[in-house]
């Protein structure tokens, strides 16, 4: 049996649908249940439902054999994990956005940036040769430039609707993201047969 850490929310739902379609799960966990561990009747998969930011930690520390996490979270955290498979679900992009009239070229002082991704944001501005001050926030990132906390934001974008509704425009794409299957190296080799079967099955999308 493989123990799989999944992020709560839409990505978990998409991942579970994918595993059901591939025969790894027989049914969905009860959406009304408060239980965070789901043992599927087929006995192939045990699911741990955790916060999206915690998936990689559970896998890296061998509390789970594998996990499904956004590429944005994995790149931000710099985890020591095997990332053998892009599942091509949960697609979005990490982008720089700002109010109309803001441009990097016209900004001559330290740029104030609000984001949930301080490492990726800092790297982006460093590679541009620009100085920045990072404000790490945990939600409602679009609010920051509207109330003067920041000049711009670095945040995930799917359709761009939330940016537009708040008077922001997308200036640059920093990272294309999608859900990745990750393994800790111990489980990848210790449960190699199950791991390879799981990867091969999910890769045939």
Swiss-Prot record:
Keywords carried by this UniProt record: Amino-acid biosynthesis, ATP-binding, Cytoplasm, Glycosyltransferase, Histidine biosynthesis, Nucleotide-binding, Transferase
Main location: cytoplasm
Intracellular or extracellular location(s): Cytoplasm
Nucleotide-binding found in the keyword field: yes
Superkingdom of the organism of origin: Bacteria
Pathway: Amino-acid biosynthesis; L-histidine biosynthesis; L-histidine from 5-phospho-alpha-D-ribose 1-diphosphate: step 1/9
GO cellular component: cytoplasm
Catalytic activity, as annotated: 1-(5-phospho-beta-D-ribosyl)-ATP + diphosphate = 5-phospho-alpha-D-ribose 1-diphosphate + ATP
SUPFAM superfamilies registered for this protein in UniProt: Periplasmic binding protein-like II
InterPro entries the record matches: ATP_PRibTrfase_cat, ATP_PRibTrfase_CS, ATP_PRibTrfase_HisG, ATP_PRibTrfase_HisG_short
Record-level Gene Ontology MF annotations: ATP binding; ATP phosphoribosyltransferase activity
EC number: 2.4.2.17
GO annotation (BP), single: L-histidine biosynthetic process
Enzyme class of the recorded protein, top EC level: transferase
Quaternary organization: Heteromultimer composed of HisG and HisZ subunits.
Chain's role: Catalyzes the condensation of ATP and 5-phosphoribose 1-diphosphate to form N'-(5'-phosphoribosyl)-ATP (PR-ATP). Has a crucial role in the pathway because the rate of histidine biosynthesis seems to be controlled primarily by regulation of HisG enzymatic activity.
Family: Belongs to the ATP phosphoribosyltransferase family. Short subfamily.
Annotated domain remarks: Lacks the C-terminal regulatory region which is replaced by HisZ.
Protein name: ATP phosphoribosyltransferase
Organism: Leptospira interrogans serogroup Icterohaemorrhagiae serovar Lai (strain 56601)
């Amino acid at each position: 049996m493989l123990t799989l850490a999944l992020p709560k929310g839409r990505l978990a739902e998409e991942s579970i649908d994918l595993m059901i379609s591939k025969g790894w799960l027989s049914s969905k966990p009860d959406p009304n249940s408060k239980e965070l561990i789901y043992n599927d009747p087929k006995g192939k998969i045990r699911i741990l439902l955790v916060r999206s930011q915690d998936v990689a930690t559970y896998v890296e520390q061998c509390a789970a054999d594998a996990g499904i996490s956004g590429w944005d979270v994995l790149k931000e955290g710099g985890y020591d994990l095997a990332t053998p498979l892009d599942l091509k679900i949960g697609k979005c992009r990490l982008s720089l956005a700002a109010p109309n009239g803001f441009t990097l070229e016209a900004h001559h002082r330290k740029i104030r940036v609000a984001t949930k991704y301080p490492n990726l944001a800092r790297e982006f501005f460093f590679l541009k040769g620009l100085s920045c001050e990072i404000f790490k926030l945990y939600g409602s990132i679009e609010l920051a430039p509207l109330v003067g906390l920041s000049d711009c934001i670095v945040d995930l974008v799917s359709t761009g609707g939330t940016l537009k509704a708040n008077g922001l425009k997308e200036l640059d794409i920093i990272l294309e993201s999608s859900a990745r299957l990750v393994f800790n190296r111990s489980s990848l080799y210790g449960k190699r047969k199950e791991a390879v079967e799981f990867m091969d099955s999910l890769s045939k999308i």
